[in-house]
From Swiss-Prot:
Residues that coordinate or bind ATP: G281, C282, G283, K284, T285, L286
Designated gene of the protein: arc
The name this protein goes by in its record: Proteasome-associated ATPase
Function noted in UniProt: ATPase which is responsible for recognizing, binding, unfolding and translocation of pupylated proteins into the bacterial 20S proteasome core particle. May be essential for opening the gate of the 20S proteasome via an interaction with its C-terminus, thereby allowing substrate entry and access to the site of proteolysis. Thus, the C-termini of the proteasomal ATPase may function like a 'key in a lock' to induce gate opening and therefore regulate proteolysis.
Coiled coil: 25-99
Amino acid sequence: MTGYDSSEEAERDSSPADGYRQTPAQLSAQIRVLNDEIAQLRRRLAITPTDTRPLERQLTESANRINALSERNEKLVVTLRDARAQLLQLKEEVDRLAQPPSGYGVFLSAGPEGTAEVFTGGRRMRLAVSPTVEVEQLKRGQQLRLNEALTVVEAAQFDVIGEVCSLREVLDGDRALVVGHADEERVVHLAAPLMDIALKPGDSLLIDSKAGYAYERVPKSEVEDLVLEEVPDVAYEDIGGLTRQIEQIRDAVELPFLHADLYREYKLRPPKGVLLYGPPGCGKTLIAKAVANSLAKKVAALRGEETHTSYFLNIKGPELLNKYVGETERTIRLIFQRAREKASDGTPVIVFFDEMDSVFRTRGTGVSSDVETTIVPQLLSEIDGVEGLENVIVIGASNREDMIDPAILRPGRLDVKIKIERPDAEAARDIFTKYLVTELPIHPEDLAEFGGDRQACLSGMIQHTVERMYTETDENRFLEVTYANGDKEVLYFKDFNSGAMIQNIVDRAKKSAIKSRIETGVNGLRVSQLLEAITDEFAENEDLPNTTNPDDWARISGKKGERIVYIRTLVSGKQSEGSRAIDTASNTGQYL
């Protein structure tokens, strides 16, 4: 150990001495090398600051180019993505357009092993069904879409177009006997939508004659256009001047419904129909509506019901006529069939024929046609045929009852005949009270004459108005008629008065009061306005009796008796046109 330590110490002692032993030449060489390195470093250090600026610029430009390329790359990616989507869409469109056409069929029933019985192309076929279609969910009569291989690939809706036929009867629950336009009978299946509907004979059905299916019940538009089902709101109290006629029709219509037990006890048959006849505008239609309203209320009270229900079938007479043979008769059958259905639960039903003479005129009187020869028997068979009319009342209205077929007017059909006459002075007062009510504004001067009593003022106004209308003075003279036997008679405006004319007079006076309020600012109705309205109303009617047949005009106007051959106007302040014979009268116009 001592020898080793001494050697290391000797080595340390000898190292510095060796460095100092280098020659000056060697040291000078090393100094030169170091000076060269220092000079080189100084040169590199001198040129280094000038080279960083271009590099920085290059770096900035490179970064900008990189950003621009990134943006372009993103835009290209979006464009390529959109182009790919468009290509896919175009491919789908091309594939869709390249597909073969699809056919349709009608589902009849489910077959074995997931097949379906389908009617397509005029044939009944058993077709395979796509797994996407559930056969159990298909309904009879439903439309199915078929591919080119006649495989059911989709369930569609039921058909909504086809032929309209009339139902004659339902056969065995899922089949029906229908009649077409040419009276061709056909048996069809009932589609699923009709299975839960209570069908009745006479219903209109939409059918597919090729597939043999009926799809839906079509509203009977021909009957809907002719029949207005309503519960009228007209009461007897709204009708003026017809107290006696109202009493007659109440005895004929209401008593059999309200006291049916007494009728059975006395073995008295209720009347089947009522004829209301008389001049136009005298309240025939109003009475018929009031009958329906009153009867409904009394029957409801008799049964202890709070709500009253009745049906008023208002038949538009002239629109019953149809150019096709048998169509008018069929419509009449449908109307009475509906009436029987409504009345089956004891609800009173009124079938109202307005202008009855236009449809049921005397057989054999037709000039250009003889439709009445079959229409009249159809009505007679409905009124007193095999099927009785329980709780159904037929009411007819006409101003030419002489033209209605006598078979309709005989007892047992239209049993009760009520004449609705033109109102006399007392009836006119009653009618005026329906339109001149205390709620109307009255002129202060007229009201002051009666001490502010509105009711007394209105009564006085009505009295003045009625006296002006019904006095037989020269200013109220209207016509001079000459009968076939040579007798002459002067007719006054009062002879042609009606409830409609009274309403028109009141309306004229009210309009005059409104115009006076606008001009003067004073509100209220005056008696002078009523008198002026009478003059205007008479002046408008003076030229109306100008029909070529005065005798026909007299029948409509309510003047019966000897045949009229001449008519001469006697209106004051107007030159007379002279007498007019039947064969010389011209310029036919409205009936008064």
